[in-house]
């Protein structure tokens, strides 16, 4: 019998997956899997169990938000495991699932995992950590990891928006230098993202035609602080239209980025806090994971 490691965050989102647990497990059992179930107990737990047990099963499935997926992927990669992954998105934002058009219905997502085939995708390595879809700094970065879990559960995605609004008074420019595949970009930026996704924070959407989550390249977006109302309007219009040709924006693709910044500048990796670095290298790991999905969902 095939073995599955099922990792579930019972606190993710509005806890909507919890009431479907029996049906999820039934779906997997009927598909011929012996299911080893692990409920996460706190931050880092999914990484630990994926690292310990991920090599010894045929499939690892995680149920939770972007953070749970990040931890699961991190555990598998740190163990050198090439085990296929299934993902049931049950968080507040689910940017990764949105980019891949994965089912947001819990039971449909479970069915997709057992009926689908492994599709290869890239993963980012940030220093000695991993991220599945984004490493970002600057405006609204803090709201992704500082919003209390009970508020996320009560308000869902709205919690991030409200928390971001309260952060407006704390926004400052960050002086950052980046060596992007041998070219240098330096300046004071309001926001920056190194991503492998069309959705960032559920608010900012990149042009799907310019994003391929399996091409070995990141998309890099840097936003300089507008100095007047005209520049604010121009910047917003460029982001909304997904035409990144205004003076405040830098948008390009790259495989590797070396970053020099204030060591006190915080980052977020897939919505989870990462401490600042004076120097850090970010690298695209081409086809580092295999995610089970139906072919018609392949982004």
Identify the meaning behind each predicted range:
Residues 136, 140, 193-209, 273:
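Glycine-rich phosphate/pyrophosphate-binding beta-alpha loops
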Residues 46, 66, 192:
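Short conserved active-site loop signatures built around small residues
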Residues 31, 40, 78-191:
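Catalytic core of DAGKc-family lipid kinases
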Residues 68-80:
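Short Gly/Thr/Asp-enriched flexible loops that form oxyanion-binding sites at enzyme active sites
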Residues 180, 186, 212, 222-299:
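ATP/nucleoside-binding phosphotransfer catalytic cores, i.e., glycine-rich phosphate-binding loops
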Residues 151-159, 199, 208-228:
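Gly/Ser/Thr-rich active-site loops/lids in small-molecule metabolic enzymes
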Residues 1-63, 298-299:
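ATP/NTP phosphate-donor binding region
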């Amino acid at each position: 019998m095939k073995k599955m490691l099922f990792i579930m965050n019972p606190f993710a989102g509005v806890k909507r997956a919890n009431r479907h647990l029996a049906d999820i497990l039934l779906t997997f059992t009927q598909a011929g899997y012996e299911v080893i179930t692990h409920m996460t107990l706190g931050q880092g737990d999914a990484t630990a169990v994926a690292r310990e047990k991920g090599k010894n099963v045929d499939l690892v499935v995680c149920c939770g938000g972007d953070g749970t997926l990040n931890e699961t992927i991190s555990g598998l990669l740190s163990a050198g495991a090439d085990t296929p992954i299934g993902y049931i998105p049950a968080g507040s934002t689910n940017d990764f699932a949105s980019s891949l058009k994965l089912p947001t219905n819990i039971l449909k997502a479970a069915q997709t995992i057992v009926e689908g085939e492994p599709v290869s995708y890239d993963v980012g390595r940030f220093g000695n950590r991993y991220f599945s879809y984004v490493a970002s700094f600057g405006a609204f970065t803090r709201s992704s990891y500082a919003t209390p879990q009970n508020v996320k559960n009560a308000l869902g995605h709205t919690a991030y928006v409200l928390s971001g609004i309260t952060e407006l008074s704390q926004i400052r420019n960050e002086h950052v230098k980046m060596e992007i595949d041998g070219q240098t970009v330096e300046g004071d930026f309001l926001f920056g993202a190194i991503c492998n996704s069309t959705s960032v924070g559920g608010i900012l959407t990149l042009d799907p035609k310019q994003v391929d989550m399996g091409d070995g390249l990141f998309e890099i977006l840097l936003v300089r602080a507008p100095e007047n109302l005209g520049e604010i309007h121009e910047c917003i219009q460029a982001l909304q239209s997904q035409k990144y040709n205004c003076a405040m924006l830098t948008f390009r693709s790259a495989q590797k980025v070396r970053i020099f910044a204030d060591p006190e500048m915080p980052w977020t990796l897939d919505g989870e806090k990462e401490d600042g670095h004076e120097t850090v290298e970010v690298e695209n790991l081409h086809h580092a994971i295999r995610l089970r999905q139906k072919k018609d969902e392949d982004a």
